[in-house]
Amino acid sequence: MLDLDYVITIHDEIIRDLGGLSGFAHAGRGGVEAALHRVENHVHYAGLDDVFGIAATYAVAIARGHVFNDANKRTGLTCALTYMERQGISIPRLADLEDLMVDVADGGVTSEELAEYFSAVWEMSQSD
């Protein structure tokens, strides 16, 4: 699982490298912590044990939680990709991922749909 300080570091590096407004949204560090607890709750209480599902839950919790002043979608996506990489699953960062994250943040794509997307991209990358 990704810890609070690691997620904040990911966000800060994104802001440093790509620009944007630094800092936390209204709930401060507690907002980030709450988003991470949502992921942990899905794992522990809902029995979520699929790598793609957990990664997608990170993306959704951070992007929809608007826990930072800026770069929530980028941070959510990077956390999802990082989680998968830590589990030995590396998927290419395709151009449509950023558009997909807009739909994730707006509620147009569920965590289940995002997990299916991650799985499909990974499976395609394995056949190359």
Predicted region positions:
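FIC/Doc superfamily catalytic core
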Residues: M1-D128
